[in-house]
């Protein structure tokens, strides 16, 4: 089902998970302020490797291309369960600024892969948990799966241990759920948030000291009995 968000851009509602791919704030707005801007403010190098969990409608990937540091090359790796969704993206009603990368959208829709001199995108159709074990290293992780309530397997301590093996400089996510933050905290990540007008808080995680407001998770640990999600099948 097509849904119009508050910034005028479109998203879809998943029948499987009964959730929209983006918040009501806006597909572009949420993507930029919770993922793209924070990530690129701390990662600026000749070649940037991004893990986009999961591909969905591709806003994270496409807006990364449109907003990447000027002289950087991007390698983007992204799992996605819904093969038919990817095939349909060539006709999705994206914002006008996406017109300049329509050739990329078309290529991905057909071949699940794109490469030119500055951009490489690989979409893996299947289980994200298996896919991340095939990767070597990543600079940025967009942790943007459906919510822990309905897509718990992509928010477990076992899952985040595999993410941690990739040594990301920053993990970005819309989630502020205590079990998610506790999993990252338990793995040695510093937890931050971002504060923009009219944008709900998310979580930024890094083992480095970053110039973002602290999430003050240690204070919360004094008031709660912490736990993290666990997937015994991982």
Predicted features and spans:
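Class I SAM-dependent methyltransferase Rossmann-like catalytic core
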Residues: 1-45, 57-70, 87
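C-terminal substrate-binding/active-site "lid" region of AdoMet-derived donor-dependent transferases
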Residues: 151-209
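SAM/dcSAM-binding transferase cores
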Residues: 1-3, 7, 114-117, 203-234
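A short SAM/SAH-binding and catalytic strip from SAM-dependent methyltransferases
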Residues: 139-154
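Well-ordered alpha-helical segments embedded in enzymatic catalytic cores
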Residues: 31-35, 127, 159
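The AdoMet/dcAdoMet-binding core of the Class I SAM-like
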Residues: 41, 46-136, 142, 196-200, ...
